[in-house]
Amino acid sequence: MNQYQQDHGNAPEQVKGRFLVFVIILILMFAYLFAGLVNLQLKSSEGYSTKTESTRLKTIPLTGKRGNITDANSVILATDEMVYNVTFYKDASESSSSVYKTYTQSIIDTLKIIERNGGKLAFSYVIQRSEETGEWEFSFGSGVSDATLQTRESQWRSNNYVTAKSYPTPEDCLVTLKHRYRMVNSAEEEEEVRAAYIEKRGDDSGYVPCIIVDEDTMLKVMAVFSEMQMNLYNSLPITIAKNVPFETVTEIETKSMMLPGMDISESTQRVYPKQTLAAQVIGYIGKIPSRTMWLTLQAKGYSYNDTIGRDGIESSMEDWLTQNSSLRKGSRVVERNNWSKIVREISYTEPSDGNNVKLTLDVNYQTVAERAIASNVARIRDKQEDLMVSSKWLEDNRTLIATYDWEHYPLELAEHGVMLVLDMQARVLAMANYPTYDLNALVAGGDEARAILSDDRNLMLNYAIGSRATPGSIFKMVTGFGALDSGVLKPDEMISDMGYYTAYNSDLSTAPKCWISEGYRSQHYYQTIVEGLEHSCNYFFYECGSRLGETRLYQYAAAFGLTSKTGIDLPGEVRSVVGSQNTLYDPTKPVGESSQDTSRPIIVFNSIKSHLKKCGESRGMEYDDERLSSCAKRLMDMAVAYPESSWVENMRTILMEELNMPRSMVYSNSVITDTYNYINDIKWGGSQTILTAIGQSVTTVTPIAVARYVTAVANGGKVYNVSIVDSIISPEGEVLSRRDPVLINDLNDTNGYFNLIHKGMKGVTDDTGTAKRYWSDFKWQKKMGAKTGTAQVNQIDLENNGWFVCFAPLDNPKVAIVVYVPHGYSGAMCSYAAKDFLNWIFPEWDKSDVDYDLPIGNSLAP
């Protein structure tokens, strides 16, 4: 054995062993890699395949038809018709320049087809040129708060990846997005975009040339992309053109392979066959107005682009009518190719239609009522315009005309009107508003819709439920019945008009009196309740109101339903208010206008604060707003809680405690007198009670509340909630819900006092009543009861509010009618609409009352 072998042992064997170990390790490594490949290929391929499939499979929600709205006789007032829409879809993962260019060209080509066949894009872009400056500006809607506009802009920027920091102006956003979608407005701009690309990348490899388009086309294309971006989260197509003609459908489907992302879908469009009839009652549908509302509706299954009822029955009955809830939606699972075209349908679940809503309205009643109120308003307007230039009116109002502030208070003449017809269980048979509008125009959008929305007459307001006004003399049936029922007035008791009513005000320059001229006052002598109503004598009802007092008068008004909402199934009803201390100022509530029934408390509150602040400043004293507010509230509460005789003493105590006023100040007339006068404005007294008794003071009522009240007068004291929905019917015809009349109060007239009220109301259009000359030629003059109401708005009589209420037939009432015309000059002038309606309905009743002799056996009828 040589020295090497001694030192290293058997070297070849050692090398061989090491090589063997290396080979084994290498084999194990390859085995591990191979196993990984096998796992990837065999075990994970199913998962990756599923993931790939999920990007190609899309579930498209399907909706049926929105439910119909019909009148009481099943005449359709609102329905859905099937239409064709053009839709667009782009997968969110596709964002390369070449993809954008392909879709841009597809949008351009599709828009040409749509517009060539008379269609138009369903929306506009949120960036537009200002008409005043020509500069680019955002347009996120009008008539909403700044906070809402900011929220909309923020959401839009986020969805379109244009932050305010990087792209602060609308023009910055426009240019960036235009280039992103591969559009320019000129060849020069295209060169600039290319040059910028080369400067950034070093060469033009990979550069995708832009399409040269005009500005109008650019905005339309960007509008489509914008709408798609706002809709990306639900991965659904957007509708870019609605209700397109069949020519458009055919051309787009024929060119389907050349129009990536485009498709034709069947949808529904809301149609209102009667157009303007009962527009404010039916309402309309529209987009979900805010993201906040959509988040609420999303839980019910609504999609972002679904429509909802925005007003009227469409709104109040949304849950019944809608086809958009998850319970009624169907679905279609489809497979799309790389260009978002549907290549096959995987499954289909049929949607359900919404339910139908049957109203209590009768189309015939509604048609006659709408024509009647339109004619009446025009007639009043003509009368007012004639009076304005008549020598007598100008002479009678000469002093007032010379001193009136015409600039700040322009003359308001009749331009609106409401007419209501209810049956004896307060079911609405007609609810007519004038002027009205075409519901189809509003749903279609465009110039006609904008004209409706911007009309100064506020066409969409349902004045029957959404407006309040002083009722005037139509309130006198409350006072009269209350006086009789409470025993403060005997049925045969006579009250004579003695001129000025001085029980609460001995100053003849301001004391109230009847409307009749002094020379004719004898006509109002020796009046029972019957003549009091017939003549509408204010003095008579001052006395009745004084005897009743504030509390009982208010209680009877409440018993007739005049202090609460009517329960009608329509959105936007406001509550009537009747004069009382708590109506004038309720010390248990905050002073703010939203908490109180009138604006007077906040006016008094601010006046007291301003006065006391000035008093302090004149003496070098400053009061912070919190202390002034606390002091003003205490002073107002004190005025309600204590008699006037103790006001001054209590005022001084409050001023010293709240503001640390020295005795010299609180004993100063300059401090006390004005404060006293201010708090006196929110203190109820007898003078306010007697004004309430004739429908004045702070009493304001809605036409719908008046209609319920007149119905109760006509039917003998039964007060019902007002109903306008008769029933809910499924698409298959099953009655799901029936809205029966709900009796909320019965005045229990066991003494027959309503017979006296009816007799007095009969005399209004007969005998010597306030409207006799307007009804002298009416065939059924003795078969109705009525009451006029003229409520003063200001010193100009032309601006008076006019009311006319009636019921018929007198002996067996079937309908109660209310006519209200803001600035309608006089109640009697408002009677024309009721007269037109009754001239139509009495013959209809006569027809139905005819007894026909039926043939016997199998004989033929003559």
Give short role names for the model-derived ranges.
Residues 78, 84, 130, 333-350, ...:
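Beta-lactam-recognizing serine transpeptidase/beta-lactamase-like catalytic domain environment
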Residues 93, 366, 468, 823-824:
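Short strand->helix junction
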Residues 94, 286-294, 488-489, 715-721, ...:
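Short helix-capping/linker segments at secondary-structure and domain boundaries
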Residues 384-394, 493-497, 551, 850-854:
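Short, glycine/acidic-rich hinge or "gate" loops at secondary-structure transitions
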Residues 734-740, 835-862:
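Short, gly/Ser/Thr-rich active-site loops of penicillin-recognizing serine hydrolases
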Residues 822-841:
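Amphipathic oligomerization regions
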